[in-house]
């Protein structure tokens, strides 16, 4: 407890924290996300000034989740996360997806932080992870002929060219 701020005192304290976050997630999905779902589908995203803008309900959903501290749940507190294990996050993701599967996909893009946290350097951590936890940025873009958005079918590979000091694609 002395080493980590906000560390649970014991098992019961940890479970209380997880239960509270699940309760908050349920409240947000029941009061905001689910009621917005149909309108989000009808409005859809649109392009404005060369940028993709979410439907207004999607923005409300994201704002509510960020305000509740539910972005970057598994990240350390120094980056704005809750320092939770993956299991409570996954349970929250199930609740969100049950309310609106499309929004569940958007909100769960925070999964990408795990890769950045594991393999990124400290500069990348400090520049990007707090912004993701704050809901300022996150995306995953992938496509390839004959694969589309099916990540399992992507064949592109990157290899490092030491001679040229750069990455080469296929």
Model-derived regions, located:
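Small-side-chain structural scaffolding
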Residues: 25, 29, 33, 37-39, ...
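Amphipathic, small/basic residue-rich leader segments at the start of a protein or domain
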Residues: 1-104, 123, 127, 166
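Contiguous, well-ordered alpha-helical segments that form the cores/surfaces of helical PPI scaffolds
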Residues: 63, 90-94, 110-118, 140
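General N-terminal targeting signals
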Residues: 50, 87-90, 109, 154-159
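Short, surface-exposed, charged/polar-biased interaction segments
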Residues: 42, 46-50, 86, 113, ...
């Amino acid at each position: 407890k002395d080493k980590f701020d906000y560390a649970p005192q014991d098992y019961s304290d940890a479970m209380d924290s997880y239960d509270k976050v699940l309760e908050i997630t349920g409240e947000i999905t029941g009061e905001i996300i689910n009621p917005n779902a149909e309108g989000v589908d009808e409005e859809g995203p649109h392009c404005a000034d060369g940028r993709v803008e979410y439907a207004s309900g999607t923005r409300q959903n994201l704002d509510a989740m960020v305000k509740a501290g539910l972005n970057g749940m598994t990240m350390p507190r120094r980056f704005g996360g809750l320092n939770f294990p993956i299991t409570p996050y996954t349970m929250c993701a199930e609740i969100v997806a049950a309310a609106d599967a499309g929004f569940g996909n958007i909100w769960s893009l925070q999964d990408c932080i795990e890769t950045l946290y594991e393999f990124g350097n400290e500069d990348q951590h400090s520049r990007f992870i707090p912004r993701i936890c704050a809901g300022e940025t996150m995306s995953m873009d992938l496509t390839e002929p004959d694969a589309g958005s099916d990540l399992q079918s992507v064949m592109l590979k990157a290899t490092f060219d030491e001679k040229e000091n750069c990455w080469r694609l296929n």
